[in-house]
Amino acid sequence: MSTVFNMDKVDFTKQPMFFGEALNAQRFDVFKYPVFDKLTQTQLGYFWRPEEVSLQKDRSDYLDFRDEQKFIFTANLKYQILLDSVQGRGPAMAFMPYCSLPELEGCMNAWQFFENIHSRSYTHIIKNIYSNPSEVFDTMLDDEKIIARAKSVTKSYDEFIEAAQQFTVAGKGTLREVKTKLFLAMVNVN
């Protein structure tokens, strides 16, 4: 049974990373895989706010770009925002419901938080360079090439989510099949 807080005493050092017992207290003193806690600490050390960075030079540089350079610059920002939007919610939607290690849960929370900051940083750039940022944001989903690239990442997330839900809710498929989809999704998004 899935629950927000498992009331049973569980030794999480003996649990698999995924599809083990539901989590309870977020203990950060004993780890099965200390590398995840170290990664979380490293990520937290990189915390910054995009608004703290001056973009005056970027704006003047952008104004000097040729039209094709502006197009490439803008398309890249759109793509980065789209991918960071996926990564900002993907780990929580796909992997967290099946996570069974507190240190991995913490690491994934930090991961998606920093993906959100990345997306904010690109938004900060757009807001400082374009007189009407909505023109950029409103056309983001109109670019077929950006959408095609995004589909290549979201496909594996979606396939894992579907397989995991079918397995846990409807009893369809096997745990091995679901874990294969999990592996493919993790490799694809990393």
Whereabouts are the PLM-identified features?
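Non-heme di-metal
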Residues: S2-N190
